[in-house]
Amino acid sequence: MPKTKKINPHLQQFQTKEMSVPVIFHTSDALLPNQHTFDQLENLGKDKRLFSHIAAMSDVHPKAGRKNPTGTIVVSKTHLFPQINDTAPNCGMRFLRTDLNDQNLTEEKIDELFKELIEVIPTKKYVGNKIPYQLAVDIAHKGINPLLSHLKSRTKNELENSSMNGNMVPAEISQRDIFDAIPKFFFHVGKYRLGILGAAGNHFLDLMKITEIKDNEIAEKFNLKVGQYIFLMHTGSGLFGQYASYMYTPKTKEHFSQKMMLKIGTTFFDSQKKQVYKNIAEKIKKYQNSDEFLGYEADSLEGKMYLTAHQASANFGFANRAVLTDNLDRALERVFGRQVELDLLYDTPHIFNRKEDHFGEDVWVHRNGTVSADGPQRMKNHPLFSQTGEPVFIPSSMSTPAYFFQQAMEQENAPKAKKMPRIAKKNYLKKWKNVMSNYTMPLPKE
């Protein structure tokens, strides 16, 4: 096992002579990763374009075909790296409160409900909930707001309690900019692909019961009670996000269908920046078998095209969770004979790139299997989270306890990890406050 320098019982630093920045492991000795993970992180840490340090969470682990482990945060002042993030922009989770409790939710009703959910929340399906082509374009451009109007969504707080209000695309990006970065053909595919949970990536829909509360004052602010049932959902942007990502990364396409769809999309790519994309395609070929990471200068035309594709396709992650929630809403009504209250506490991505201010610098933060956990000051524009800090939830792993907490203090460059979830029928939720505070100490700039 490579040697690490212990900062405290839950923080360890790893850096070899060849590395430009260190890796900070947010973990104890018992949870340090395997050699392959260390090797990947060492290779990444050699890149001179990185900023400060690489943060690696307690569940950091390699995935086949990926150059960067899941459970990492990587930062650069100048560059965007498509191989740092998995090809699933805005894979994420949403936490849904309900008005269900033991008085109105029996074991028989749970069985009846899950039989219904198997039909309306599929893990595998060729066609999900079909939407109009223009709505697919509007989702990419404007986020979930037009979709919620189309669905006539009954879920409370769905827009305001989605991270970034359910839209990663900046206001200055036009529809034409999106068509210059993503082939229109992909939108014709994407309009059929919402409402599918997905079988890859440990995607799930869990029903959970709150069994313990550690801070009643905070729990009351979040409208959480002992005995209350909630849903936790994990899924991403689906095939649309994959196709848009594969256009800009040297990562090997895992299936023949991905290669075929990418070929069709790029062959009939009606972009005003075709020459720029040709340059990108040439770079991708050069980095196909390289140990180095392909990086786009963020201010270049290539970087702007990649970022637009990433952000626009990421909106399909918010949209997929919104459609699945609508399907859940209708299923609950059929089973219970009434409208069951669904109230979104938070929807948060864990695969995304975003410009943020850390250590007084504007930097590009790449989160791969990790979430942001901003304190009240950074959440100052939200009516509730400006008081509590950003909500964070760690899901169950095959019926182990799950945890919910919030970031009560400001921390520099200290995002939290997503655990390794699995499908489970009924789990138990505990409410913890500041349970991770020892894991997120500010770190000095390298």
Put a short name on every predicted segment:
Residues 2-43, 49-56, 62-70, 74, ...:
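Domain-length cofactor-binding catalytic modules of enzymes
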Residues 93-96:
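A short, polar/proline- and glycine-enriched secondary-structure boundary/capping micro-motif
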